[in-house]
Amino acid sequence: MTRIIATFAGLLLGTQSALAEPALHECLGRTRFESPEAFEWATFAIERSNMKGAGGHVFSKNVHAVGDYVSYDFDELTIRVSDATTRENFERQRNAIVHETELYKKRLEDKLETNKDLLVSIKEMNYSHDEVKKQEERIKKLEEQIPKVKNYEHDLGIPDSYVLGSKEKPYEFLLWRNNRVFYFNMNKPAENSAQRIKDLAARFEARDLYEVPEGPGVCMPYGFIHDDGKTGFNVKNSLRFTSTPNVIMSLINASLGNHAKPTDGTYDTDYRPGYDAEIWKKSKIMERFYIGDRMTTLEGWRLDPRPETTEQDRAWFAIAHVGGLASPLIAAQMFTFQKGTDGLKDLVPPPEAVVPRFLKLTRSIREQ
C-alpha cells in the first residue's frame, strides 16, 4: 500500500510539473536568460517620432531610460525597433526620411541666398579682398553641396523594404516584419553597401516575445541578426515586469573592446537626486547581486516617505555590472517612476519587492 501511495504521489508531482508555467526564455545582445514572470520590452514610439531622428526605445512618453537602441559593428550600424504598428506607419517612415532630406536641402538653399546677399553687402561696404574671397568660397561650397542633397531609393529585391541613400551608396533601410518597423542606418557605409544591406537583411530574423532563435547572433527586442559570433556590438534596452510597471530595468550587453560603459544612459542626478528631506528619508542600497554566475554589488539609493508626512510614494535607483575590461560588459540599471506618470496607477514598490525578481532574471543570464 505504501508503494502504491508513493507511486501515485510521484505521478501527481509529475503532472503538476507538466502543468507548471513554461520558462519565459528571452535574449539580448549575445546573452540569453529566463524571466520569472511576464515582462515587456521598451520599443520606439512610431506614432510620435520619426525613427531616423534622435531618440531611443520607450514604454511611454515619460517612462523610459536613455539611449535604448542597438549598435552593430557592420558599417557602424544603428538599429531601432518600433512598437506594434500598421503598414501605413511603415510607409510614413519612408516618407519622413525623404521629407527630411528635402527640408535639409531647402535650408541649404536659403543659406545660399543669405550668403549671396551678404556678398553683395560686403562688396558695397568695400571689405578687403580676402573677406570677399572667403565669402565667395562659402557660396561655391554651398552651390556644390546642394545638388548632391537628394535621397535615392534603391530596389535591392528585399521584400517589404525601403532602401535609401545617395546615388552611389544606399545607407539606410526600413524592414516591415511581424507588424513592426525595423530601422537600420549605416553611419559609415562601405563601397559595396548595397550588397552588404542585402546580406544583412538575409541574416535578420524578426521574432516574437519569448522566442529565441538558434545559433550565434545579436539579439534585440523582436529581432535577431544571425552571424558568426565575432562582430562587435552594443545593445542597451529596458524591460519591466507587467505586474510592476513603475520599475524598469535597463540591460546593457557589449562586446569586448566596445566603448560602452555600465553607466551609459545615466545622469549625475540619477546618482545624487534632489529631494525634500522633510518628506523623504534617503538611505543607501548596497547588496550582493548576480549577473549570470558572477557575483557583483548592486549599489544605489532609496527615498522612502517619512511616516509623519502624508506622502506615500517613493523612489529608488540601483546599478550593477560585470565585465567590461577583460570580458564582454553586462550591466543592469534600475529606475522608478512615480504614480501618475503617464497614467501609472500604483505607487512605486520598494526595492525588496522587485529586486529579488530582477535577480532571478539576471542570475539566469548566459552568454552565447
Question: Which functions belong to the PLM regions below?
Answer:
Residues 48-89:
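Long, solvent-exposed N-terminal ectodomains/accessory regions
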Residues 6-15:
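Bacterial N-terminal signal peptides
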Residues 1-5:
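Bacterial N-terminal signal peptides that target proteins for export
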Residues 29, 35-42, 184-221, 332-368:
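Surface-exposed amphipathic alpha-helical segments
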Residues 17-22:
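Boundary at the C-terminal end of the N-terminal hydrophobic targeting segment
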Residues 74-175, 238-326:
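Signature of long, low-cysteine stretches enriched in small and polar/charged residues
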Residues 191-197, 205-261:
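Charge-rich, low-complexity N-terminal segments
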Residues 165-189, 316-343:
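A short, solvent-exposed beta-edge/loop patch
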